[in-house]
Each structure stands twice: as structure tokens, then as C-alpha cells.
Swiss-Prot record:
Subunit structure: Interacts (via N-terminal extracellular domain) with CRF and UCN.
Cytoplasmic side: 143-149, 219-225, 296-306, 369-415
Domain of life from the UniProt record: Eukaryota
Organism: Xenopus laevis (African clawed frog)
Keyword list, A-Z: Cell membrane, Disulfide bond, G-protein coupled receptor, Glycoprotein, Membrane, Receptor, Signal, Transducer, Transmembrane, Transmembrane helix
Glycosylation sites: N38, N45, N78, N90
GO biological-process terms attached to the record: adenylate cyclase-activating G protein-coupled receptor signaling pathway; cell surface receptor signaling pathway; cellular response to corticotropin-releasing hormone stimulus; corticotropin secretion; regulation of corticosterone secretion
Membrane topology (UniProt): Multi-pass membrane protein
Gene behind this protein: crhr1
Gene Ontology cellular component terms for the protein in this record: neuron projection; plasma membrane
Name of the protein in question: Corticotropin-releasing factor receptor 1
Amino acid sequence: MLLAKTPCLLLVQVIAAGISFALTSLQDQCETLQHNSNFTGLACNASIDMIGTCWPSTAAGQMVARPCPEYFHGVQYNTTGNVYRECHLNGSWAGRGDYAQCQEILKQEKKTKVHYHIAIVINFLGHSISLCALLVAFILFLRLRSIRCLRNIIHWNLITAFILRNVTWFVMQLTLSHEAHDSNVVWCRLVTIAHNYFYVTNFFWMFGEGCYLHTAIVLTYSTDKLRKWMFICIGWCIPFPIIVAWAIGKLYYDNEKCWFGKKAGVYTDFIYQGPVILVLLINFIFLFNIVRILMTKLRASTTSETIQYRKAVKATLVLLPLLGITYMLFFVTPGEDEISRIVFIYFNSFLQSFQGFFVSVFYCFLNSEVRSAVRKRWHRWQDKHSIRARVARAMSIPTSPTRISFHSIKQSSAI
């Protein structure tokens, strides 16, 4: 039995010796800190706690912060957090340090994954709600021919651009698997091209909205002289060569991962991001001039056209910062701390996915012309069906009283 226990005892002794050597080494380091510190009053001596954190000599009444341990019992921890321990007024350490900020890296990754999964749900929910609202708005502009003026045609095209962008977003999410993403097949690159094209058209149609309002209000130029083809060129045609140039750049300099994302040191995405930033800045200038004119010259005016312009400006003032802020989020890197990353994930997911919903609300559902036309259609439908109901009731009257009265008339005439 003694012979059987001897190897085990030797192993235990070796491990104990190793731990003792490590603790002695750490203790020596802490004692070195003790000798290097100069305190005249009461102070806590340098010491090592049970976890292995070295606490330097500290003046009484002070709180000490030390980095979290990198490893403990084979588990890796995030060293960006701190451990806190108080040196009491009597020169003795608190019983144990506060390790609340020291979190396992795997545990943090699990938390981040949970938040990413929630963000994916928000994205799908937001894009679904946006797509439904945009389709309703599209049908309203399609059916209500009485309100089909240039201003509403621009709204209609903006809504169409958002519909196509949402559709291509769903196509990307449902078809671009990890295998397709890594293999960089042709069809997945075409899907990315389509999504980026419709993404750019959103901003150029917003630019068309700004051009129309700036021309009508600031330049006092008759909108009757503006032509639909001008805005079609701005919204649909100009983004096309921009995306073609971007695709050529991707093909030669960053031809991987379905052209989604970017390689470090390669800036081909700025081929389409640059024009988008430019039209956003121009739109901000347009809106500044429009608001200035409205506040100075049109404040006392109550004409119906001026009221429509004011409402359009309000909608654009709300939507343009919304679109601009969400786009600029791509250039913002969240901080290293967990809270800033979580806030960034949720904020970005919400604004990106609900853009189409906000566009349909401000440019269609809150549009007084659309609401008036829908109300007229509804009243016309009610009147039409009420007439049909009256005719149906008249046709359903029994004929027996008519025959009786006719027989009585015949008898009276015979008498």
C-alpha cells in the first residue's frame, strides 16, 4: 500500500512545491513594492490574496485598483476590468477584493451573441413592418390618380426605392449562406450589387426631394417647368454608373466574400459612399435655406400650396437627419466597453430596419392630399353601396299587395 501511495504522494509534493514557488515569487514581488513605497503614517502592507492578485503597500483609508487576473483555474478573464480592495483606517486590508468587474471572456462572448441574436430579430421585424407599410403606401399612390402631381411622384419613387432595397435585404439574408459567402459565387455578388444600388437610390431620391423643395421655395421657380425625367435621372440613372465603378473596383481589388464588407487598406466602398455623403451634405444646405425662407417670408402666408410645402419640409427635416445619422453610423466604431457595444447594436438595428416605415408614414400616411383622397374614395364607396342597398330593398318587396290592389281596382271599375 505504501508503495502504491508513493507516486501519488510525490506528485502532490511536486505540485505543492510548484505552487509554493509561484506564491513565493509573487510574494517577493509584492515585498519589492513594499520596499519601494514610502508612507509616513499607517499603511497596509503589500500582500497577495488567495486568487493571486498582488496588492501593493497602500496608505490607510485608500481604495486600491488592480487589473483583473488574466487566468484563474484555467479560465481566461477580461483584463480591461479592475479589482478593488480597501485599506482600512487601522492599516489592515479588507477581507477580500471586489472582483465583480472580472468576467470570463467566454461568458462575455455568450452575452454578445445573445444581443446579436436579438438584433437580428429586430432587423427582421423592422424590415418586415417597413416592407408592409411601404407596399401599402405604394398601392395608395398607384390607385389615387387624383393626387398624381410631380411632388407626389417623387414621394412614390422614393417609396419604390425603399421597397426594392428591403426586398434585396431579405434576399441577402435568406440566400447568402456561409458557403456562398466564402466561395464568392457570381450570383451572390450580383445580389450585393443590387442591394447597394437600391441603397444608393434611396439617398439620391432624398436628394430629389430636397431639390424640388429648394427650387420651389428658395429659388421661387415655378414647379410646372420641372420635368419628371429630371428627377428620374437623379434618382435612378446617376446611381447606376457609380455602382458599376464600385463593382469594377471590387472585382480587381477586393474580389472576395461576395463583395460584402471590406478588406483592410482597400477603400473601394468609398466609390459609392462618397457620392452619398456629398448628396447628404447638399441636402442639409438645401434644408437650411428652405427653413430660413419659410421663417422669414412665408410665415404669414396661408395659401394651400404654402401649407403643402411646409408639411413637406417638416417631413424632410425629420427624415433627412434620420437617414444621415443611420448612414454615418457605418463610420463609427463602438467603444471597447460592453455597454457601448450593446447600445450601438440595438440603435443601429432599429434605425436601419425601420427607415422604410418612417418614410411611408411621413410621405404617405400623414400626407394630407393622400388622406383627403382616401376619405373621398371611402365616402364614394359608402354612397355607392348605400344606393345598392336601397335598390336591393326595393326589389325585394313582395308582389302580392300589388296584385290585390290591381284586383280591387278591376272590381271597382266593373261596378
